[in-house]
Amino acid sequence: MRAKTLWNLVPPVLLIPAAAWILWQEVRPPSRPDASARDRTVAVTATALPGDGAMLGPFRLAGALALASSDTGFGGISGLAAMSDGRLLAVGDAGQWLMLRPVVQAGRLAGVADVRMGAFSAATDKAAMDGEAIVLSPGGRTLISLEQQHRILVFDGRGPPRKPARTMFRTAAAGWPPNGGGEALALLPDGAMLWISEQARRRDGAHVALFTRADGTTVSVGIPGVAGFSPTDATVLDNGRLLLLHRLYNGVESQAAISVVDLSAIVAGGDTAAARTLVRWGRRSQWPVDNMEGMTVAQEGGKPVLYLVSDDNFNPAQRTLLLRLELAAPIPSGPAVPH
Protein backbone atom coordinates (compact mmCIF):
# COMPACT_ATOMS: atom_id res chain seq x y z
CA MET A 1 0.00 0.00 0.00
CA ARG A 2 1.32 3.42 -0.83
CA ALA A 3 2.31 5.86 1.90
CA LYS A 4 -0.38 8.31 0.72
CA THR A 5 -3.03 5.65 1.17
CA LEU A 6 -1.69 4.79 4.61
CA TRP A 7 -1.88 8.42 5.71
CA ASN A 8 -5.48 8.62 4.49
CA LEU A 9 -6.37 5.82 6.91
CA VAL A 10 -4.85 7.60 9.93
CA PRO A 11 -7.29 9.66 12.06
CA PRO A 12 -6.50 13.39 11.68
CA VAL A 13 -5.92 13.79 15.42
CA LEU A 14 -2.96 11.42 15.16
CA LEU A 15 -1.33 13.20 12.24
CA ILE A 16 -0.04 16.13 14.31
CA PRO A 17 2.15 14.07 16.69
CA ALA A 18 3.21 11.84 13.79
CA ALA A 19 4.29 14.84 11.73
CA ALA A 20 6.09 16.31 14.73
CA TRP A 21 7.99 13.03 15.23
CA ILE A 22 9.10 12.98 11.58
CA LEU A 23 10.23 16.61 11.75
CA TRP A 24 12.12 15.96 14.99
CA GLN A 25 13.97 13.08 13.36
CA GLU A 26 15.14 15.48 10.64
CA VAL A 27 16.20 18.46 12.76
CA ARG A 28 17.24 17.00 16.13
CA PRO A 29 20.94 17.31 17.01
CA PRO A 30 22.54 13.93 16.27
CA SER A 31 25.18 12.17 18.29
CA ARG A 32 28.57 13.16 16.94
CA PRO A 33 32.21 12.15 17.34
CA ASP A 34 34.36 14.29 19.58
CA ALA A 35 36.16 16.60 17.14
CA SER A 36 39.11 16.80 19.53
CA ALA A 37 39.55 13.03 19.61
CA ARG A 38 42.25 11.33 17.61
CA ASP A 39 41.35 9.28 14.56
CA ARG A 40 40.28 5.94 15.90
CA THR A 41 39.55 2.36 14.97
CA VAL A 42 35.86 1.50 15.16
CA ALA A 43 34.42 -1.95 15.82
CA VAL A 44 31.59 -2.59 13.37
CA THR A 45 29.33 -5.62 13.05
CA ALA A 46 28.15 -6.51 9.55
CA THR A 47 24.99 -8.56 9.12
CA ALA A 48 24.38 -10.09 5.70
CA LEU A 49 21.00 -9.32 4.15
CA PRO A 50 19.04 -11.39 1.61
CA GLY A 51 18.75 -10.58 -2.07
CA ASP A 52 22.09 -11.68 -3.51
CA GLY A 53 21.92 -11.93 -7.28
CA ALA A 54 18.64 -10.06 -7.62
CA MET A 55 18.52 -8.00 -10.82
CA LEU A 56 16.98 -4.56 -11.22
CA GLY A 57 17.49 -2.79 -14.52
CA PRO A 58 21.15 -3.09 -15.52
CA PHE A 59 22.31 -3.83 -11.96
CA ARG A 60 22.81 -7.06 -10.03
CA LEU A 61 22.92 -7.01 -6.22
CA ALA A 62 26.26 -8.52 -5.18
CA GLY A 63 25.96 -8.38 -1.43
CA ALA A 64 24.18 -6.20 1.12
CA LEU A 65 25.09 -5.57 4.74
CA ALA A 66 23.52 -3.89 7.75
CA LEU A 67 26.31 -2.15 9.68
CA ALA A 68 26.18 -1.33 13.39
CA SER A 69 28.59 -0.09 16.04
CA SER A 70 28.56 0.80 19.72
CA ASP A 71 30.54 3.97 18.89
CA THR A 72 28.07 6.82 19.39
CA GLY A 73 29.54 8.70 16.43
CA PHE A 74 28.74 5.91 13.98
CA GLY A 75 25.82 6.65 11.65
CA GLY A 76 24.33 9.54 9.74
CA ILE A 77 26.36 8.69 6.63
CA SER A 78 25.45 10.92 3.71
CA GLY A 79 28.23 10.82 1.10
CA LEU A 80 30.53 8.14 -0.28
CA ALA A 81 33.73 8.09 -2.37
CA ALA A 82 35.94 5.27 -3.64
CA MET A 83 39.67 5.48 -2.99
CA SER A 84 42.29 4.13 -5.38
CA ASP A 85 43.44 1.48 -2.87
CA GLY A 86 39.99 -0.11 -2.65
CA ARG A 87 38.80 1.58 0.52
CA LEU A 88 35.61 3.64 0.80
CA LEU A 89 35.60 7.09 2.38
CA ALA A 90 32.34 8.53 3.72
CA VAL A 91 31.17 11.71 5.42
CA GLY A 92 28.19 12.29 7.64
CA ASP A 93 25.73 14.67 9.23
CA ALA A 94 27.73 15.09 12.44
CA GLY A 95 30.96 16.43 10.96
CA GLN A 96 32.56 13.00 10.82
CA TRP A 97 34.41 10.94 8.24
CA LEU A 98 34.37 7.15 8.06
CA MET A 99 36.81 4.94 6.17
CA LEU A 100 36.47 1.20 5.61
CA ARG A 101 37.61 -1.60 3.34
CA PRO A 102 34.89 -3.73 1.72
CA VAL A 103 35.54 -7.45 2.05
CA VAL A 104 34.52 -9.14 -1.20
CA GLN A 105 34.43 -12.94 -1.34
CA ALA A 106 33.34 -14.98 -4.35
CA GLY A 107 32.12 -11.81 -6.03
CA ARG A 108 29.86 -10.66 -3.21
CA LEU A 109 30.16 -8.15 -0.38
CA ALA A 110 30.76 -10.29 2.70
CA GLY A 111 31.94 -7.81 5.33
CA VAL A 112 33.96 -4.70 6.12
CA ALA A 113 37.44 -4.31 7.61
CA ASP A 114 39.89 -1.64 8.79
CA VAL A 115 37.11 0.73 9.87
CA ARG A 116 38.33 4.11 11.12
CA MET A 117 36.52 7.29 12.00
CA GLY A 118 37.37 10.88 12.85
CA ALA A 119 36.11 14.44 12.56
CA PHE A 120 36.47 16.76 9.57
CA SER A 121 34.91 19.66 11.44
CA ALA A 122 35.53 21.06 14.91
CA ALA A 123 32.18 22.86 14.86
CA THR A 124 29.51 22.06 17.42
CA ASP A 125 26.57 23.57 15.52
CA LYS A 126 24.97 21.06 13.13
CA ALA A 127 24.44 23.81 10.58
CA ALA A 128 28.21 24.22 10.33
CA MET A 129 29.15 20.54 9.99
CA ASP A 130 26.36 18.88 7.99
CA GLY A 131 28.39 16.88 5.46
CA GLU A 132 26.31 15.61 2.54
CA ALA A 133 28.69 14.60 -0.26
CA ILE A 134 32.37 13.84 -0.77
CA VAL A 135 34.48 13.61 -3.94
CA LEU A 136 38.19 12.98 -4.56
CA SER A 137 39.71 15.19 -7.23
CA PRO A 138 42.27 13.98 -9.79
CA GLY A 139 44.45 16.85 -8.57
CA GLY A 140 44.86 15.24 -5.16
CA ARG A 141 42.23 17.02 -3.09
CA THR A 142 39.14 16.00 -1.15
CA LEU A 143 35.95 18.06 -1.45
CA ILE A 144 33.03 17.92 0.98
CA SER A 145 29.65 19.54 0.36
CA LEU A 146 27.85 21.00 3.37
CA GLU A 147 24.23 22.08 3.45
CA GLN A 148 22.40 24.48 5.77
CA GLN A 149 25.41 26.80 5.55
CA HIS A 150 25.87 25.95 1.87
CA ARG A 151 29.53 25.64 0.95
CA ILE A 152 32.21 23.22 -0.19
CA LEU A 153 35.24 22.46 1.97
CA VAL A 154 38.47 21.69 0.10
CA PHE A 155 41.10 19.54 1.84
CA ASP A 156 44.63 18.83 0.66
CA GLY A 157 45.22 15.13 -0.06
CA ARG A 158 42.96 12.30 -1.16
CA GLY A 159 42.07 10.68 2.13
CA PRO A 160 40.56 11.30 5.55
CA PRO A 161 39.77 15.04 5.67
CA ARG A 162 41.13 16.74 8.77
CA LYS A 163 41.82 20.43 8.17
CA PRO A 164 40.31 22.30 5.20
CA ALA A 165 42.72 24.25 3.03
CA ARG A 166 39.99 26.56 1.80
CA THR A 167 36.24 27.01 1.51
CA MET A 168 34.30 27.48 -1.72
CA PHE A 169 31.14 29.58 -1.67
CA ARG A 170 28.69 30.11 -4.52
CA THR A 171 26.45 33.18 -4.20
CA ALA A 172 23.70 31.46 -6.20
CA ALA A 173 23.45 28.75 -3.52
CA ALA A 174 22.54 31.27 -0.81
CA GLY A 175 18.85 30.99 -1.72
CA TRP A 176 18.72 27.21 -1.53
CA PRO A 177 16.54 25.76 1.27
CA PRO A 178 18.56 25.45 4.51
CA ASN A 179 18.05 21.70 4.82
CA GLY A 180 17.72 21.05 1.09
CA GLY A 181 20.91 22.44 -0.37
CA GLY A 182 24.01 20.86 -1.90
CA GLU A 183 23.16 17.21 -1.46
CA ALA A 184 25.07 15.83 -4.47
CA LEU A 185 28.49 16.77 -5.84
CA ALA A 186 30.40 15.46 -8.85
CA LEU A 187 33.70 16.26 -10.56
CA LEU A 188 34.00 15.56 -14.28
CA PRO A 189 37.25 14.31 -15.85
CA ASP A 190 37.96 17.74 -17.37
CA GLY A 191 37.78 19.41 -13.94
CA ALA A 192 34.23 20.76 -14.23
CA MET A 193 32.07 20.49 -11.10
CA LEU A 194 28.33 19.88 -10.68
CA TRP A 195 26.65 20.77 -7.36
CA ILE A 196 23.00 19.71 -7.10
CA SER A 197 20.41 21.08 -4.66
CA GLU A 198 18.12 18.58 -2.99
CA GLN A 199 15.04 20.81 -2.83
CA ALA A 200 15.58 23.94 -4.93
CA ARG A 201 13.66 23.49 -8.19
CA ARG A 202 12.95 25.39 -11.36
CA ARG A 203 9.44 25.95 -12.66
CA ASP A 204 9.81 22.98 -15.01
CA GLY A 205 10.46 20.73 -11.98
CA ALA A 206 14.16 20.18 -12.62
CA HIS A 207 16.47 20.39 -9.63
CA VAL A 208 18.62 23.50 -9.55
CA ALA A 209 22.34 22.81 -9.86
CA LEU A 210 25.46 24.91 -10.24
CA PHE A 211 27.82 23.87 -13.01
CA THR A 212 31.36 25.23 -12.69
CA ARG A 213 33.32 24.81 -15.89
CA ALA A 214 37.01 23.99 -15.98
CA ASP A 215 37.74 27.68 -16.63
CA GLY A 216 36.04 28.63 -13.34
CA THR A 217 32.83 30.14 -14.72
CA THR A 218 29.66 29.01 -12.94
CA VAL A 219 26.17 28.78 -14.43
CA SER A 220 22.82 27.60 -13.06
CA VAL A 221 21.44 24.49 -14.79
CA GLY A 222 18.58 22.04 -14.37
CA ILE A 223 18.93 18.34 -13.53
CA PRO A 224 15.75 16.27 -14.05
CA GLY A 225 14.75 14.27 -10.99
CA VAL A 226 12.49 11.34 -10.19
CA ALA A 227 8.93 12.33 -9.26
CA GLY A 228 8.45 12.37 -5.50
CA PHE A 229 12.13 11.69 -4.80
CA SER A 230 15.08 13.85 -3.77
CA PRO A 231 18.60 13.53 -5.24
CA THR A 232 21.14 12.51 -2.60
CA ASP A 233 24.45 11.65 -4.31
CA ALA A 234 26.12 11.57 -7.69
CA THR A 235 29.04 9.66 -9.16
CA VAL A 236 30.71 9.98 -12.54
CA LEU A 237 30.02 7.04 -14.84
CA ASP A 238 32.06 8.11 -17.85
CA ASN A 239 32.90 11.30 -19.68
CA GLY A 240 29.72 13.35 -19.84
CA ARG A 241 27.48 10.97 -17.89
CA LEU A 242 26.88 10.41 -14.21
CA LEU A 243 24.67 8.27 -12.02
CA LEU A 244 22.36 10.06 -9.61
CA LEU A 245 20.95 8.45 -6.45
CA HIS A 246 17.50 9.49 -5.23
CA ARG A 247 15.59 8.71 -2.05
CA LEU A 248 12.04 8.96 -0.77
CA TYR A 249 11.73 8.89 3.01
CA ASN A 250 8.69 10.13 4.91
CA GLY A 251 8.97 8.36 8.25
CA VAL A 252 6.65 5.60 7.08
CA GLU A 253 8.53 4.00 4.21
CA SER A 254 11.75 4.31 2.24
CA GLN A 255 12.24 4.03 -1.48
CA ALA A 256 15.28 4.65 -3.66
CA ALA A 257 16.04 5.20 -7.32
CA ILE A 258 19.04 5.56 -9.62
CA SER A 259 19.03 7.62 -12.80
CA VAL A 260 21.64 8.26 -15.46
CA VAL A 261 22.24 11.91 -16.33
CA ASP A 262 23.71 12.99 -19.66
CA LEU A 263 25.49 16.32 -19.28
CA SER A 264 26.47 16.75 -22.93
CA ALA A 265 23.86 19.49 -23.50
CA ILE A 266 25.12 21.42 -20.47
CA VAL A 267 28.75 21.02 -21.48
CA ALA A 268 27.78 22.40 -24.90
CA GLY A 269 26.23 25.50 -23.31
CA GLY A 270 22.64 24.43 -22.65
CA ASP A 271 20.85 24.82 -19.34
CA THR A 272 19.16 21.42 -18.90
CA ALA A 273 20.57 17.89 -18.74
CA ALA A 274 18.89 14.78 -20.09
CA ALA A 275 18.07 12.01 -17.61
CA ARG A 276 16.64 8.51 -17.56
CA THR A 277 15.46 6.52 -14.55
CA LEU A 278 17.23 3.16 -14.44
CA VAL A 279 15.81 1.52 -11.31
CA ARG A 280 13.62 2.26 -8.32
CA TRP A 281 12.96 -0.01 -5.38
CA GLY A 282 11.17 -0.11 -2.05
CA ARG A 283 10.35 -2.44 0.80
CA ARG A 284 8.69 -5.00 -1.48
CA SER A 285 11.78 -5.25 -3.65
CA GLN A 286 14.38 -8.00 -3.32
CA TRP A 287 16.93 -5.25 -2.69
CA PRO A 288 17.24 -3.90 0.87
CA VAL A 289 16.33 -0.23 1.25
CA ASP A 290 16.49 2.51 3.85
CA ASN A 291 17.26 6.22 3.62
CA MET A 292 19.74 5.81 0.73
CA GLU A 293 22.09 8.82 0.60
CA GLY A 294 25.59 7.83 -0.57
CA MET A 295 26.81 6.29 -3.84
CA THR A 296 30.14 5.83 -5.60
CA VAL A 297 31.68 3.88 -8.47
CA ALA A 298 34.74 1.78 -7.62
CA GLN A 299 37.05 -0.15 -9.92
CA GLU A 300 37.50 -3.78 -8.88
CA GLY A 301 39.37 -6.19 -11.11
CA GLY A 302 39.21 -3.68 -13.94
CA LYS A 303 35.42 -3.52 -13.77
CA PRO A 304 33.17 -0.81 -12.31
CA VAL A 305 31.04 -1.69 -9.30
CA LEU A 306 28.63 0.54 -7.44
CA TYR A 307 28.48 0.99 -3.66
CA LEU A 308 25.46 2.53 -1.93
CA VAL A 309 25.09 3.51 1.73
CA SER A 310 22.11 4.69 3.78
CA ASP A 311 21.81 7.44 6.40
CA ASP A 312 20.18 6.18 9.59
CA ASN A 313 19.79 9.74 10.98
CA PHE A 314 21.13 8.34 14.29
CA ASN A 315 17.65 6.87 14.64
CA PRO A 316 17.44 3.34 16.15
CA ALA A 317 14.43 2.63 13.92
CA GLN A 318 16.63 2.97 10.83
CA ARG A 319 19.71 1.13 9.57
CA THR A 320 23.07 1.84 8.01
CA LEU A 321 23.05 -0.30 4.87
CA LEU A 322 25.95 -0.94 2.51
CA LEU A 323 25.05 -2.39 -0.91
CA ARG A 324 27.34 -3.57 -3.70
CA LEU A 325 25.93 -3.51 -7.25
CA GLU A 326 27.50 -4.98 -10.36
CA LEU A 327 26.81 -3.65 -13.84
CA ALA A 328 25.23 -6.67 -15.48
CA ALA A 329 24.20 -4.83 -18.66
CA PRO A 330 25.19 -1.61 -20.46
CA ILE A 331 23.80 1.63 -19.04
CA PRO A 332 21.28 2.82 -21.65
CA SER A 333 21.70 6.17 -23.35
CA GLY A 334 19.18 8.23 -25.24
CA PRO A 335 16.85 11.20 -24.90
CA ALA A 336 15.37 12.26 -21.60
CA VAL A 337 12.56 10.14 -20.22
CA PRO A 338 9.72 11.92 -18.32
CA HIS A 339 10.07 11.53 -14.54
What are these regions (language model features)?
Residues 2-339:
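Sequence/structural signature of beta-propeller domains
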